[in-house]
Design a protein with these regions (language model features):
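Polybasic, lysine-rich low-complexity intrinsically disordered segments
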Residues: 2-6
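Short, Lys/Arg-enriched N-terminal segments with co-localized hydrophobic residues
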Residues: 9-19
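N-terminal, Lys/Arg- and Ser/Thr-rich interaction peptides
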Residues: 17-41, 225-227
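A short, structural micro-pattern
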Residues: 19, 68, 126-130
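Beta-strand elements of well-folded, non-transmembrane domains
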Residues: 27-31, 78, 134-142
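Residue-level signal for secondary-structure boundary sites
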Residues: 33-35, 82, 142-144
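Glycine/small-residue-rich interface belts in oligomeric ring/scaffold proteins
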Residues: 39, 44-89
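Internal, well-folded beta-alpha domain core
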Residues: 89-91, 99-243
Length: 243
């Protein structure tokens, strides 16, 4: 397994600086589905939110090309409960060839999918009644301007989160499962955990960490362990993160 280092994270982060620029976001919802990639036919969720899904939630609140969100820690607040449901999905998607043809014709007249003709009902094993606290920091990317600072973006995120603002509705894995969110201010206690001692400590197995977009969209995985309801997420370039 190869380990790649992304251009947005080219050096070890400064721990003290990360703590100063750290945010904590409480997210929750009725249902969630963080799909396991090894399940090809039916959707089956991981036991908890993945770092990539957590990053997507933060980016939905605030993101610019100048920054990348790095997930440090995930707090699991509610017991892991699964439910089997049936979801309507499309059997396919519009092909790249059709999109290219529409661009050349400068017309989208034929660029559509008839949902009623392509709808399929599929079983899914999803999570029910979930709540997490996402602890993260931001790093500057190669696209950051000379006047860009991490602190500026952290403050922008905090202002937007306090007001409930977002670029798009955050979701818990899939769009059908929206996420509610609330900023946890510095010094403010975390929401209470409903986990029992046995539920709070478990090996969650190999889990998707994130996608390496700089090296062929390669998925990277890490061995997730929950201790006292907390999952420490290793840095993307750490030795224990495998491609």
């Amino acid at each position: 397994m190869k380990i790649h280092k992304t251009s947005s994270e080219t050096a070890l982060p400064n721990q003290k600086e990360n703590q100063m620029n750290q945010i904590r976001l409480h997210v929750w919802g009725d249902y969630a589905c963080f799909t396991r990639p090894e399940m090809k036919v039916e959707r089956v969720s991981y036991d908890v939110i993945t770092p990539s899904a957590a990053r997507g939630i933060l980016a939905a609140v605030h993101w610019k090309p100048a920054i990348r969100w790095v997930i440090d820690r995930i707090y699991v607040l509610k017991p892991i409960r699964f439910e089997s449901v049936r979801r309507n999905e499309l059997g396919g998607k519009i092909s790249a060839g059709k999109v290219s043809g529409a661009m050349k014709r400068k017309s989208v007249a034929d660029l559509y999918t008839l949902i009623e003709d392509d709808r399929q009902q599929r079983a899914a094993t999803v999570l029910k009644d979930v709540a997490y606290v996402i602890e993260a920091h931001a790093v500057l990317t190669a696209k950051a301007g000379a006047d860009e600072t991490v602190t500026k973006h952290i403050e922008m995120f905090k202002r937007r989160a306090k007001k409930g603002q977002c670029f798009q509705q955050p979701c818990l894995g899939v769009r059908e499962f929206p996420a509610d969110f609330a900023l946890i201010d510095e010094g403010e206690p975390l929401p209470p955990s409903a986990l029992s001692e046995s539920e709070a400590n478990r090996d969650l197995g190999w889990m998707l960490h994130d996608i390496d977009f700089d090296h062929g969209n390669t998925p990277h995985f890490f061995r997730a362990e929950m201790k006292d309801g907390v999952i420490d997420v290793p840095p993307f370039y750490a030795e224990e993160v495998k491609a």
